[in-house]
Amino acid sequence: MTDRTQPHAVQVHTTAGRFGDTAAGTNRYADRGPSTSKVIAVITGLPIGGTLLLFAGLALAGTLLGLAVTTPLFILFSPVIVPATIVVGLSVAGFLTSGACGLTGLSSFSWVMNYIRQTHGSVPEQLEMAKHRMADVAGYVGQKTKDVGQ
């Protein structure tokens, strides 16, 4: 048996930077325009987000208008407890609806912006990068197997 107490050196070989950077430090994808999927995401995401923000604004305006109209009527023409319960319930429902639509719209905008700013390449580029990494790992494992066998 061989003595295994000696330390072994590990060699790491890299082929390219993580986010498409080349050895010169420039992005090789910078000269390209937005991909088709990004354009489609913007075209579909912005109207959806804008529509949801519009619904949030309409729900808020409707809630405030309803409160402005119904509060004096309830105070003048009916007992106190039932209308107060209805007013509070409707106002809470309106504000929650407005907030939910607003958060949904802002989340849509945030998702679109994150998708646009995404620095990863397209699927074929990611597959090519994965192939290179697998080839590097296979070469490393082969070299280590030869080293251990000697």
Curated annotation (Swiss-Prot):
Statement: the UniProt record of this protein carries the keyword Oxidoreductase: no
Transmembrane residue ranges: 39-59, 73-93
Gene Ontology CC, one term: membrane
Membrane topology: Multi-pass membrane protein
GO terms (BP aspect): lipid storage; response to freezing; seed oilbody biogenesis
Keywords: Allergen, Lipid droplet, Membrane, Transmembrane, Transmembrane helix
Tissue specificity: Expressed in seeds (at protein level).
InterPro entries for the chain: Oleosin (IPR000136)
Subcellular location: Lipid droplet; Membrane
Known role: May have a structural role to stabilize the lipid body during desiccation of the seed by preventing coalescence of the oil. Probably interacts with both lipid and phospholipid moieties of lipid bodies. May also provide recognition signals for specific lipase anchorage in lipolysis during seedling growth.
Family to which the UniProt record says this protein belongs: Belongs to the oleosin family.
Protein name: Oleosin Ara h 10.0102
